[in-house]
A protein has these predicted regions:
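N-terminal secretory signal peptides and thylakoid transit peptides that target proteins
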Residues: 1-14
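N-terminal alpha-helical "arm" segments
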Residues: 24-50
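Short Gly/Ser/Thr- and Asp/Glu-enriched loop/turn motifs at secondary-structure junctions
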Residues: 50-55, 237-241
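Bacterial Sec-dependent signal peptides at the C-terminal "C-region" and cleavage site
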Residues: 15-25
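Short, surface-exposed beta-strand-loop junctions and turns on beta-sheet-rich folds
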Residues: 63-65, 251-252, 291-293
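Short, low-order "capping/linker" segments at domain edges
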Residues: 284-296
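A contiguous, surface-oriented mixed alpha/beta subdomain in the mid-to-C-terminal portion of proteins
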Residues: 24, 28-32, 130-276, 284
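Charged, alpha-helical interface segments at or near domain boundaries
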Residues: 38, 55-200
Length: 296
């Protein structure tokens, strides 16, 4: 699916128009909307959609992460912006986007090569509603486990047609995805502080799109428990970009639970307001009694 000649000729005028201040245009979605307009002209037959994340756009089988592109364009002339945007789209989707339900065999990366880029993800159920062939499994009432192919400028959630092209079952994805995610998580910082006279809390925030999914990583969660100094902790992932954990004896536990709910409703990148208990045996939802102890 190649860009139309008319579209390519027209983008000099589109990108040369005076642009508003770009201080917050990535976070408020204006930059994404600019890219969507360009994409619709370049690939008029492609299915292009957005969600509540202003830093990404879905183009057929691809999910493009726009943060790096936005940073690269800062301070550039309009002519240079045009050149770099078109170069980014060509590099990210060589040959153009392909439909979700029929990835061309010539472009299907062998699984032996792709497995090094597998990552584990946590996504809301509406992702599966929007893309019915997405490979998922239940995690909690509000979250599904999914799998992604990671790249600097995009990630691609794994779909059933991709499994068919690779000749594998969905169960094959989990082990390498967890292993790769654990390896990356070793470099992720965890900040811990007291919560008044009793208890401690910890946070871990990243902008790589995988902070919430680290709930699924035993090695990372062991680091969080060590930072809090106790074998059993409460943890939540209200948005994609951070997790928060605290000791069960924290005098601020009810207040923290309110912060979790508020962050989930405020977003962006909302994931879940659920509270989980983490210990060496694994992760589980809080019991009714534990929820009541947190004002729930």
């Amino acid at each position: 699916m190649q860009p139309t000649r008319r579209a390519l000729l027209g983008y000099g005028a589109l990108l040369a128009c005076p642009s508003p201040t770009r201080a917050d245009d990535l976070k408020d979605g204006r930059f994404r909307d600019e890219i969507v307009t360009i994409l619709r002209g370049l690939y008029p037959a492609a299915t292009i959609s957005t969600d509540d994340d202003p830093e990404q756009v879905h183009v057929e089988a691809y999910t493009l992460y726009l943060g790096n592109l936005h940073g690269d364009l800062r301070g550039r002339s309009e002519a240079e912006r045009q050149r770099r945007i078109l170069a980014f789209l060509t590099r990210t989707m060589p040959g153009g986007p392909y439909p979700k339900d029929s990835p061309p065999p010539a472009r299907t990366e062998p699984f032996a090569a792709a497995r090094a880029r597998l990552r584990i993800q946590l996504v809301p159920p509406d992702y599966a509603t929007r893309t019915p062939d997405l490979v998922t499994r239940p995690f909690s009432k509000r979250l599904l486990v999914a799998y992604a192919l990671d790249e600097p400028n995009r990630y691609q959630l794994i779909t059933m047609p991709m499994l068919t092209a690779w000749g594998i079952e969905a169960g094959v994805l989990d082990e390498p995805a967890r292993r790769n995610s654990e390896a990356e998580a070793r470099q992720v910082s965890i900040e811990a502080s007291p919560t008044g006279a009793t208890g401690r809390f910890a946070t871990s925030a990243t902008e790589d799109g995988y902070a919430a999914s680290r709930l699924l990583l035993p090695g990372f969660m062991e680091r969080v428990r060590k930072a809090l100094g106790t074998p059993g902790i409460i943890v939540a992932a209200p948005t994609r970009e951070f997790i928060i954990a605290w000791t069960p004896d924290s005098e601020a536990r009810a207040r923290i639970a309110k912060v979790v709910r508020a962050s989930f409703h405020k977003g962006p990148y909302s994931r879940s307001d659920e509270l989980f208990h983490s210990d060496p045996a694994g992760l589980r939802p809080l019991t009714a009694a534990e929820l009541a102890d947190h004002g729930r």
